[in-house]
C-alpha cells in the first residue's frame, strides 16, 4: 500500500465542505447530456432510418461517423485540456455541440445528416477526458473511485431517462422534436456550467479548509502540462502499462457501445417491439448498470482502499469479477424469451459497468503529473476507435449480411475476453509513470 493511502486509512480526517461533490454532480450532468445525443440517435434510429431511407449499413455509418470525429479529437483535446484547463475547453465545446444538436432537427438529406453527426462528435470529444481531469484535480485518491463512478455511470443513466423520453417525443411528435428538445436542454445546462465550474484554487465557493484538504491529500494539483506533447505521446505509447489499460478498457467499451447504439433496434427486430416498448425495455439494463457502476466500481472500491488494501489488488479483483459477469449478455442470443434476454443483458452490462470507473481511476494514477487528460484521451481514443467505430459500423454490416445480431454479439464477447487478458497480464501494478 502507498504511504498516502496508509496515512489516510489510519487518520480520522475530517472532510470539510462539499463543493467537490457539487462539482462531481456537475460533471455527471455534462456526461448525461453528452450521451443524450447518442441515446436519441439510438432510440430514434428506426424513425430516422425511415425518414432518410437508410439501409442498416448506412444507419451504422450514422452511428459510427460521430465516433470517427470524436475519436480523431481525443489526442488534440487531451493536449488542449492539459494546457488551457477544463473550464474553457468544456465551455466552448458544450456551446457548439448544443447548437449543432438544435440545427440537426431541421436537416434534410443524408449527406447533411452525416456532416452534422461528424461535427457534433468533434465538439463533444472533451466530455470524458475533461471529467476525468476535473475529478483528478478535485478529489484525493481515497474518494476518486466514487467520484469517477458518478460521472461514468451518468453515461448509463442517460439511457434510463433518455430512452423513454426520446421514445415518447418520437411517438408523440417526431424525431426532430426529440433533438430540438435535447439541444435546448443542452444550452440551458451550458449556461449553468459556464457560471459554476472552475478548478479548486480558483473556485469562489470553496472553503479554505476544503481546499487545504484537497491539496494535502491530492498528488495532482495543477492543470498545466510540464511536457511537450510529442515526447510525452512517444513515452506513453511505448509504455506497456498504457497499452494494458487502453486495450483492457476497450474490452468494456466494445460491448458498451454495441448495446448503446443497437439495443433498441435489437429489441425491435428480435422481438417485434414498437418504438415506445423498446425504449422502455432499453432503460432496464441501463438502470441496473448505473447502480452497479456506483455501488461496486465506486463505493466498494473506495471502501477497500480506505481499509488499506493495495490499489492494484482492489482494481484487479473488480475487473476480473466484473468482466466475468459481463459474458452473461451473450445469453440474450440463446433465448426467445424477452424476460430472460433482459436479465442476461442486465447482468452482463452491470458486470462491465463496475469496471469502467476503475479504468478512469487507473488512468489518473498512471499518468505523469500534469498529463491526466492526455492519458485519459488515449484511453478514450482506443475505446472509441475499436469499441465505438468498429462496434457500431461492423454490427450494422453483420446484420445486413446475416439478418441477426448473433455474430455481432459473439464478436463483442471475444473483444471482452481480450480486454480482460490485457488488464490482468499486460497492465501489471498500478504505479505512476515517471518521465
From Swiss-Prot:
It is found in: Cell membrane. GO terms for molecular function: transmembrane transporter activity. Coiled coil: none annotated. InterPro entries: MFS, MFS_dom, MFS_Na/Anion_cotransporter, MFS_trans_sf. It is a multi-pass membrane protein. The keyword Cell membrane applies. Pfam families: MFS_1. Signal peptide: none annotated. GO terms for cellular component: plasma membrane. Keywords: Cell membrane, Membrane, Transmembrane, Transmembrane helix, Transport. The keyword Cell membrane applies. The chain crosses the membrane at residues 26-46, 61-81, 96-116, 119-139, 150-170, 177-197, 242-262, 281-301, 325-345, 347-367, 385-405, 407-427. Its main location: membrane. Belongs to the major facilitator superfamily. Phthalate permease family. PANTHER family: FI19708P1-RELATED, SOLUTE CARRIER FAMILY 17. This is Uncharacterized transporter YybO. The lineage of its organism: Bacteria, Bacillati, Bacillota, Bacilli, Bacillales.
